[in-house]
Amino acid sequence: MDGTLLNSDKTLSEENLNAILKLREAGGKFVVSTGRVMQATRHYFEPVGVDFPVILSNGGMIYDCHENKVMWSEYLPEGSSRKMVSDLLERFPEACAEICTPEHIYDVQINEQERIHWKKGGFTAEIMESLDDVPDGNWCKVLFAMPE
């Protein structure tokens, strides 16, 4: 979506909105495919609607917006993912880990870069005291934010 459907200020341009409407008028269908998770995507396409399930997390999840349910997903391996995140947070204590599940976004070691990411992405996360507080299972994406 970034750099394609959305313009540089992360909004859906009038031109793209009109193109979607024109596509539908011609009998076409509109679908979204993005590296984002649902919480950082939904508010962009709700005004225009989608005709098919949305492809999220770089193909790691297919989500039916009409039924509000995950149709298919490939989650990160539980044990090794938690260990990797733990190791990286220990090595880079200034980093924030953003852990995404179908229902929640959790932040561990919140920092200013992550707060900027929230603002640009149009979402917020649940701030966790430690990685141990993040529930196991259904991690679909992990991002790291840190100062340059």
Spans of features found by a protein language model:
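Active-site phosphate-binding/coordination module
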Residues: 14-114
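Conserved acidic, metal-coordinating active-site core of Asp-based
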Residues: 87, 91-148
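Asp-based phosphoryl-transfer active-site loop
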Residues: 1-10, 84
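Short capping/connector residues at structural and topological boundaries
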Residues: 10-11, 17, 67, 76, ...
